[in-house]
Amino acid sequence: MARSLKKGPFVDDHVMKKVLAAKAANDNKPIKTWSRRSMIIPEMIGLTFNVHNGKGFIPVYVTENHIGYKLGEFAPTRTFKGHKGSVQKKIGK
């Protein structure tokens, strides 16, 4: 179920403080965050976030197309190695 429009987008307070400080200082350093649940809002356009995926940090550059999504959607947490195949398929028959 989607979030109610009257509530507005959710952004963690510590992320919002860092965004406003980076915009005021015109700073291009990436903002390191573990807050995958924070929604991307228009104030974040042009900033780079290092989003934690459980193991490391994935750089996410925010553009206009990202507005309305969450930061965690752009930092995958799982790596797909492929389904197990037979030995003959790997050799090439």
Curated annotation (Swiss-Prot):
Name this polypeptide is given: Small ribosomal subunit protein uS19
Family the UniProt entry places it in: Belongs to the universal ribosomal protein uS19 family.
A Gene Ontology term for the protein's cellular component: small ribosomal subunit
InterPro entries found in the cross-reference section: Ribosomal_uS19, Ribosomal_uS19_bac-type, Ribosomal_uS19_CS, Ribosomal_uS19_SF
Protein's job: Protein S19 forms a complex with S13 that binds strongly to the 16S ribosomal RNA.
GO terms assigned for molecular function: rRNA binding; structural constituent of ribosome
GO BP: ribosomal small subunit assembly; translation
Gene name, Swiss-Prot/TrEMBL: rpsS
Keywords: Ribonucleoprotein, Ribosomal protein, RNA-binding, rRNA-binding
Entry's transmembrane regions: none
SUPFAM superfamilies xref list: Ribosomal protein S19 (SSF54570)
